[in-house]
């Protein structure tokens, strides 16, 4: 019996065995990502793909300053409104800035035909050469070129007119038919602007041009149009009952344009040889211009970012991220960040990849924790970690490269009569924007799911690598841990980690320890059976004694009559 009790004591006294665990890195990161199946998954590492900040400044673009139109708009600048004289010397820019209160446009009232299309053309121009297409001094010898001035375009209190146009009127009582041609030899497109004057009365027509039935004809290989003045009474605008309509065309290299008129011509004086590029644009912004430089400009401010997406503004100029409506686009690069609960013991829940990661392992994503007589410690598996880092880095770079189509996105121009087209265009643009946003978000969700699954797969592979080496020299105890059936010193532990574990060397010791443990289990079962029998007999005796005592007490006080028959 003493031997049995000794075996039972041994069964409840377990010596601490050598142990090795497979696990993964955890840290104090609070980064969260979304996946297809989950939201706000905390991860150890992640990269942001969405730029949401700007510097609040209008800057030079790649070292080239923008053209700030100030109180002028594009029309006032190109026509040469006297209030825009400071812009006459501008010949190159990175982009063009209008403000919300750019009031100086056409000074003489009238309509600028196809003005929105002209703005679109100028959006792709980064510089031009302003030159006299028809010199004022000798191009119109039979007509007056100095009397065409008006109070509508006054400057510093004196009558004036556009700096790039000539208002040609009769000389004396004669306005002979004029004809003037220009052949483009600039080697690039030339922007030519002219106008047609529409007087309010026939007397004004005669006093200015003499000819009652005047016309203006403009023709090139691509443009051909004849204009006749529309004489009619109109309400005064800026003190003028007359109107001027403004026209423009682009003349190709080698092409010739001819102006013919018997009156009412607002002739071109200066024209513009255009240098086109893809990086310019026109933006409307009240943001101040600063002495700074950027690669991407929005009306709100400059973006200095290499990220593939931004949600600052849909209008951009330069090498800019794609605008999306998203508020968060974060891609996971690390693992699920689930630090283990330290109070649960070294080889409880904290030890494995099932319930939590290790904050103590800081030099890799996956690795080992061991404990033996020589101590305990963490060690990262550098090979699997490096392979994972390379794979995920390549994936992130590939995603950024594919989605990082940087370009200029400027607003399209529509006049007041094209509201339906403008509204339709906005709907189309919104549709494309929704598609871009959906694609970006879906891409990130899918890649995050794949990345986290990839990490889980790598940890599982590391676990299977250890398991296949140890075989029956150790047993699985959960949470990614193995308990050795033999003593495993630091050299032994290192061999498990680097894949050189010598199974035959430890198999005999492991076999003996397994058999001893199994024997203890069998002896323990015998003890448990003996104790169960003793416990049953003792319980029965106690029950019988209790019943006898109760019966004796009841007989003694008359509650129970006892008759003994012989």
UniProtKB/Swiss-Prot annotation:
InterPro entries: Capsid_hemagglutn (IPR008980), Hemagglutn_HA1_a/b_dom_sf (IPR013828), Hemagglutn_influenz_A (IPR000149), Hemagglutn_influenz_A/B (IPR001364). Its main location: virion. Residues 1-17 form the signal peptide. Palmitoylated. The keyword Cell cycle does not apply. It comes from the Viruses. The record marks 344-345 as: Cleavage. Residues 551-566 are cytoplasmic. A lipid is attached at residues 555, 562, 565 (S-palmitoyl cysteine). The chain crosses the membrane at residues 530-550. Disulfide bonds join 21-481, 59-292, 72-84, 107-153, 296-320, 488-492. It is a single-pass type I membrane protein. Belongs to the influenza viruses hemagglutinin family. This is Hemagglutinin. It comes from Influenza A virus (strain A/Swine/Netherlands/12/1985 H1N1).
